[in-house]
Amino acid sequence: LSIGTRPDCLGEDVLTLLSELNTIKPVWVELGLQTIHADTAAYIRRGYPLSTFEAAVKNLHARNLEVIVHTILGLPGESSEQMLETINYLNCQPIQGIKLQLLHVLKGTDLADDYLAGKFQTLSREEYLDLLISCLEHLSPDLVIHRVTGDGPKNLLIAPLWSSAKRSVLNDLHHIMKVRNTWQGRLYKEDLYD
């Protein structure tokens, strides 16, 4: 059973119910973190501080519930270094999985308004693949990768349009990693995260 929720929606009653369900069937709880950076979190209106995420992960871990964390690569204003800081932070958390999502700009959103006003650019396919590979190289080899890209609804997608060719992006990822002779965890240094 996979349940996607916000860290600030995990009260004691919900945690108790999830623990009970976990005795019947394995439960994975998916939490949307997106980024560890407060300025970016405020811009995208995440709506809770990093400490709330940390408390939720701690509470889920204490109940032996598996945790998958959603991150977004390419958020406006974030550098590659900041995105890697989010990955390195997650290496220190008692989580079991990660979803690495590309930023999608969808029609009818404030993000779309900012994009169309030229306030930020989305990542090119090459930039995304380079950044994604760097994230994978730094990611603990013990974490299960549940997603490395996604595709927004085609009728709403403004940018990046290349992301709608999901299979091709995945094929390029596999090819580039093979050519570079790299893999998940290649640059992971466990002693940095203890």
List each model region and its residues.
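Conserved SAM/AdoMet-binding glycine-rich loop
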Residues: L1-Y48, T52-A55, H61-A62
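Catalytic cores of alpha/beta
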Residues: E12-L18, P76-C92, N155
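Auxiliary Fe-S-binding modules of radical SAM enzymes
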Residues: N91, G97, V105-D194
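Conserved strand-turn element in the central/C-terminal portion of the radical SAM core barrel
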Residues: A38, L60-Q82, L102-K107, D114-T122, ...
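Aromatic/hydrophobic pocket-lining residues that form the small-molecule binding cavity
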Residues: F53-E54, S79, M83, Y128, ...
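Short, hinge-like loop/turn segments at secondary-structure boundaries
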Residues: S19-L21, Y48, T86-I87, L116-G118, ...
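Hydrophobic faces of well-ordered beta-strands that scaffold small-molecule active sites
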Residues: L1-I3, V27-L31, V67-T71, Q96-L100, ...
